[in-house]
């Protein structure tokens, strides 16, 4: 090992505590991808591509994973020799990617041999989160997750250097790392207090919305399932919509179009095989979608059936995990929504429908946020689940000047599907909660009535 700074190569997200906040833009970097066995790396490579990183070569080593260094020590030394020549495709390689959630022991061992920056799956995701975090809360959440990941590495590095000291290598490196760990712990304390204030404020806002009679529909699903596109289709609100993994990192709230009493909450997507510790600081982000009356579980219908099954189970398990550890007592109705049906054939839809029958799923919808196919039906189902049946109301417009006030109140508290005027009466079909309608009957006793 080349001294304590060498461990900066395995700190989460390009530098972490040793090099300050580290870089956030990794566009154009060159990397080697190390893989054991015949694992499917397509999703991992998509994550890398989202970062703008170019994989120069995918190196595969058959056999069992080395518990101490992931790849065998001999193979790592050959890679180190190849990189040290700095010629051809390897000339600008500045990053080693591991297709695994590596242990601290493995990461430090690889750093000792290769001496350049090393990311496993968790560190790749944290670097991606860092590049997409724009709000103070999101940056705080990501920083906490990074520091927690960093601390495990630093503790392992201290252990390695302390062992080296006993063998006669000296203890200055271990002492320097212990100082950094102390600094890291102090920063974690500060950040957790800051995040606690954000979390408390967000919880108060949600409670206030509930007291005002607002309903929330949360969007959840695997990353890139089409949540942001559906959010825009339902709310009419312009949001970033990209065909990239984790383009949404922080919660976005919007009012359902033409329905002021319903909010849509879009939040971070789920992904397979990520430790709970990496998501622990995002509890308040998930809460925006989970503290809802309805949760829409989105699935990309254009995926293969195997991928649909895998992503469905990942999201389902993550939802259960988040609810188990959550501090709120919230029950919600779940609706399954298959997205991007404009991209698939009738044959594929038939196969998906058979899968739905096999899984015994209920209240399932097929939509396209691009062509808007199925959006009206989904909206109708949301209203039905929230409000029960469509209400038919008569407004007496000549009722001592209260008619127009009553109409305005109905528009403000519900969703008007159809209206018709006849003489001094207005006939409305409206989606509205029983409690809100009761308030309006009380407020306008001689002006509005059931048809």
Predicted regions and their residues:
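Short alpha-helix plus adjacent loop in nuclease-associated cores
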Residues: 124-142
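Conserved C-terminal guanine-recognition region of P-loop GTPase G domains, centered on the G4
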Residues: 20, 41-49, 81-90, 101-117, ...
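N-terminal accessory targeting/assembly segments
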Residues: 1-127, 448-451
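Conserved nucleotide-binding/hydrolysis micro-motifs of P-loop NTPases
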Residues: 38-39, 63-64, 101-104, 123-127, ...
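Flexible beta-alpha connector loops of hexameric P-loop NTPases
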Residues: 65-68, 132, 238, 268-278, ...
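Switch I (effector-binding) loop of TRAFAC-class P-loop GTPase G-domains
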Residues: 209-215, 232-263, 271-287
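C-terminal-of-GTPase-core extension/linker across diverse P-loop GTPases
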Residues: 2-32, 151-225, 231-232, 320-451
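Conserved beta-strand segments of the P-loop GTPase G domain that flank and frequently precede/overlap
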Residues: 33-36, 58-62, 97-99, 297-300, ...
């Amino acid at each position: 090992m080349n001294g304590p700074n060498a461990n900066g190569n395995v700190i989460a997200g390009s530098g972490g505590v040793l090099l300050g906040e580290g870089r956030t833009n990794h566009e154009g970097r060159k990397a080697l991808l190390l893989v054991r066995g015949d694992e499917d790396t397509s999703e991992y490579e998509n994550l890398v591509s989202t970062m703008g990183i170019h994989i120069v070569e995918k190196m595969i080593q058959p056999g069992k994973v080395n518990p101490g260094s992931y790849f065998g020590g001999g193979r790592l030394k050959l890679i180190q020799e190849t990189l040290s020549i700095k010629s051809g495709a390897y000339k600008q390689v500045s990053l080693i990617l591991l297709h695994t959630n590596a242990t601290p022991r493995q990461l430090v061992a690889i750093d000792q041999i290769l001496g350049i920056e090393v990311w496993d799956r968790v560190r790749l995701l944290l670097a991606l989160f860092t590049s997409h975090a724009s709000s103070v809360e999101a940056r705080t959440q990501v920083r906490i997750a990074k520091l927690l990941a960093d601390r495990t590495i630093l503790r392992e590095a201290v252990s390695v250097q302390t062992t080296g000291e006993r063998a006669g290598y000296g203890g200055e490196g271990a002492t320097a790392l212990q100082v950094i760990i102390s600094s890291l712990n102090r920063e974690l304390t500060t950040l957790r207090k800051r995040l606690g204030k954000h979390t408390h404020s967000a919880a108060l806002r949600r409670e206030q919305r509930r007291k005002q009679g607002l309903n929330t529909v949360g969007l959840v699903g695997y990353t890139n399932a089409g949540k942001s596109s559906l959010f825009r289709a339902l709310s009419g609100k312009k949001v970033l919509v990209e065909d990239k993994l984790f383009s949404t990192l922080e919660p976005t709230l919007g009012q359902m179009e033409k329905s002021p009493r319903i909010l849509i909450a879009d939040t971070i997507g789920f992904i397979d095989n990520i430790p709970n510790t990496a998501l622990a600081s995002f509890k308040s982000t998930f809460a925006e979608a989970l503290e809802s009356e309805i949760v829409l579980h989105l699935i990309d219908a254009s995926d293969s059936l195997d991928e649909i099954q895998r992503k469905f189970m990942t999201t389902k398990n993550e939802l259960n995990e988040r609810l188990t550890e959550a501090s709120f007592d919230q029950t919600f109705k779940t609706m399954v929504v298959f997205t991007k049906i404009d991209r698939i054939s009738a044959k594929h839809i038939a196969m998906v429908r058979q899968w739905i029958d096999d899984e015994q799923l209920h209240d399932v919808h097929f939509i396209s946020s691009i062509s808007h196919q199925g959006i009206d039906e989904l909206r109708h189902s949301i209203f039905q689940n929230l409000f029960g049946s469509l209400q038919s109301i008569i407004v007496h417009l000549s009722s001592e000047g209260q008619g127009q006030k009553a109409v305005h109140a109905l528009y403000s508290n519900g969703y008007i599907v159809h209206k018709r005027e006849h003489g001094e009466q207005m006939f409305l079909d409206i989606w509205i909660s029983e409690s809100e309608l009761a308030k309006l009957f009380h407020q306008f006793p001689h002006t509005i009535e059931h048809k």
